[in-house]
């Protein structure tokens, strides 16, 4: 029963953590507990995202890792703007952040590969996310269907790109567009790779990597990353 409940929580994107006493020292499996910069950012975004704390902490570390690298940031699959706000808070003023989403729900999906259906996650809007990120500079909204909304960015370079698109065709389009435009040492992060509700996301990443002769790194958080060497 316990295992089934844990699996159910993971299916819907939640983390279940037990209590362990480390005599006042940080839990090595919860390194954010003594990272005040992250905790402050987390408090600002937690009510605007479905991404759990472990995955947010991974994104936080990757933003810091790529901070001095050339290239912009991008997120595809913004939903209500929580992770976009995390990026906007952490990035330098000089770095540009591109945000791609329909801001009205999912596009058509592949019934053989995806569980989600067209219109899922429609409880958001462009104006909602714009208001959430108000005051953060160098943020560019690209509303509509990706990859058409990436038109004009063919010569852009990216240091970190975050994919939270859930479905096969969108994730594959993401890989095809961003991978050749990653800076050396740049990273693609896939939020839904290990999610039981997003089998098409994992299938797309694996298909793309097989075609490129590269490999994704599956993280204990359920995310996956691809580095550009």
Where are these regions (language model features)?
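Boundary detector for helix-to-coil junctions that initiate low-complexity/charged tails
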Residues: 1-29, 47-50
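S-adenosylmethionine/decaboxylated-SAM
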Residues: 25, 32-50, 60, 69-229
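Short amphipathic alpha-helical segments enriched in hydrophobics
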Residues: 16, 67-70
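N-terminal pre-P-loop "Q-motif" helix
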Residues: 54-58
